[in-house]
Amino acid sequence: AHKICGEQMAAVYWQDWGVPSIGIRPAIIYGPGRDQGMSAAPTIALMAAEVSEAYTIPFTGDVGFVYVEDAAERFIAAASRSFEGAHVFDLNGTPATVTEMLALLHNHYPDAAIEATGDPMPFPAEANSGALEQLIGLDDCRPLETGIADTVTGFQAAKARGVDLADMYQHTLGKTP
């Protein structure tokens, strides 16, 4: 309710004082750095696969997957570009099933003990309309396959720099102080 109220207040600010705004409602954001909350499960699953740990994504079904860099670009552009009006956009990225996401994960980690169980997420998994990208001048979000590959590359680069991903994974799960 607070988010909807904020969107409506933004419309009033535009109507009464000419203050422009963009509200962005992202779907499941995944990729390096996305490690908190239930919706971080796809990223945690990829990290688990990278460190050869088992993991279960706690939801199934259709999901809109938004790569973290694509989300960041949109938020930065929304805050830094000039426009008129009070806009609200869903940011759905690439609609896919969790099963499809797991298949892409297993392309990179064939022996990974990663699975999914549970109810579907209660959000629509629809394609982006393109209206946000048109307003702020960005290309479409990257395909899920590319985002998964970029996440794998990011984790491998972190390991090559000496980041202890196994420890980071355990910390993400709350298993280390």
Regions found by a protein language model. Give the residues of each.
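Active-site helix of classical SDR
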Residues: 2
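NAD(P)-dependent short-chain dehydrogenase/reductase
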Residues: 8-63, 70
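C-terminal substrate-binding subdomain of Rossmann-fold SDR/epimerase-dehydratase oxidoreductases
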Residues: 58-61, 65-177
